[in-house]
Amino acid sequence: MPQEYIIEHHNFKFRVGDSEEKGGCTFIGGEWKDVTAQELFKNKKVVLFSLPGAFTPTCSGEQLPAYDEAYDKFKALGVDDVYCISVNDAFVMNAWAKSQNLKNVEVIPDGSAEFTRKMGMLVKKDNLGFGLRSWRYAALIDNKIIKKLWIEEGFGDNTSGDSYGKSSPENILKDLKQL
């Protein structure tokens, strides 16, 4: 990926307005909404972080809650929004956000993995039974331009480890203070 990669055209499939519980675990009654990359990233400074999957140990127990707690610190440094993206569908991402009691971070579904593929972060996790997933990373995006990437160690297909540190909110905040 070039040093300053511009995020141009991409449509994300969100579910909005689902409120009627169905089967004890899924909420329905809403509708599909296309949200473009333009809407998410144009004229904004955004921290986007990606992780292998909703409801997984590091993602649920450490990464997502840490970003939600650090939200005000990001805002104080001029960040407009903090987004979490994962190769999961909108139903999964919404259920995960609800289960995590998110207050600040917005979750973005990348069910088809197209955005992750365009970012060059799509990896195989067949060794864990996950299939195609995102590598763990974070990005500082300013008006659709990726200004900085924090990519976890060991990038590759079917790795045994699950490194987490470079893309942690603490590390990103430390770097943002120096920019």
Where are these regions (language model features)?
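Chalcogenol-based redox active-site neighborhoods
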Residues: 1-179
